[in-house]
């Protein structure tokens, strides 16, 4: 049985990435303060359809994701369909796979096209760290249910007397891994210590990311893949990511204190991604349908892979597990790639994965390979800057990476590119695209 993955429909047509778009990414409580993930999702999907001059009635499926879920609109995908002029009968459902969420939504639509169930679909994701599901304590929640059942005033007073002042305080969403209680930042600290990643190297990678992102924006290369967002009450707009340090100075990074291990740590706010708001989306079609409608795709999906590892130690190693599987399914080696886009959740996590790509020991012990994945050529790696600069709205990052690598390959005359990410829960995702 061949290990090659056939990302094609029954007619042998490839899955085309026709277009991609995102909102600018904004730090928490700044430009998108008060704007929900749903509103950002509708915003970007509407604009993507408009720019592509695609009849919304032709869209047969929308798969959209969110990580910080809002109880008021648990199926964000369906709400986007209802708010963007698509047929009310358009198939729509929501997914969540932590930071790999929009990789998952893209693959789900691709697989629907591969099976012949649909010909045209939209995938993406959105998250807001500024509009959060603030909840109540477990004790108060229990009491509220009991109050609803209580019949007499005396019963209600008895229930209320069980509560202390701290039980009445609002509870923000947890930032820790449910299974371990560790935050992503604490995991990044773990990885820095396990793999001997220095503070200087972390700061240098962050500086590189901000410098390249600034150059990319100033060159105009992101103009066609980032929309201008007008935010209610429509007295202002945002047309550029606002986390990028446009005058990044490497020496200034050393001034920050460690954020997660104050005494012995090396992970700081400057070499980590901030909490971010934003949304992204891509249009996928069968190759034949794209051609019939007159589109010139920005790329095609060649292979993809998802993996999972234990969460207790160094769980953000997803790229080191998912990438070799995606390469194998594409019949490729790392050196065959033209570009590599790796999600930079933390500089420590990124550098640890880069180190393990080149490790024969890791390949033999963890992957069962007789050779390393390969040393990363920095002239191919995150050439436009990465998440450390752009920011990281959890569910939006995957389709941001896919669009960005496809469009950069297009500018370079074609080739193959890798988009890969780690994710909470020990998850990993990788996708290889080809561009003509």
UniProtKB/Swiss-Prot annotation:
Keywords: Acyltransferase, Cytoplasm, Fatty acid metabolism, Lipid degradation, Lipid metabolism, Transferase. The active site is at 99 (acyl-thioester intermediate), 392 (proton acceptor), 422 (proton acceptor). Pathway: Lipid metabolism; fatty acid beta-oxidation. Its EC number is 2.3.1.16. It is an enzyme of class 2 (transferase). PROSITE patterns: THIOLASE_2, THIOLASE_3. The keyword Cytoplasm applies. InterPro entries: Ac-CoA_C-AcTrfase_FadI, Thiolase, Thiolase-like, Thiolase_AS, Thiolase_C, Thiolase_CS, Thiolase_N. It is found in: Cytoplasm. The keyword Lipid metabolism applies. Gene3D superfamilies: 3.40.47.10. It catalyses: an acyl-CoA + acetyl-CoA = a 3-oxoacyl-CoA + CoA. GO terms for molecular function: acetyl-CoA C-acyltransferase activity. Catalyzes the final step of fatty acid oxidation in which acetyl-CoA is released and the CoA ester of a fatty acid two carbons shorter is formed. Belongs to the thiolase-like superfamily. Thiolase family. Heterotetramer of two alpha chains (FadJ) and two beta chains (FadI). HAMAP family: FadI. This is 3-ketoacyl-CoA thiolase. It comes from Shewanella denitrificans (strain OS217 / ATCC BAA-1090 / DSM 15013).
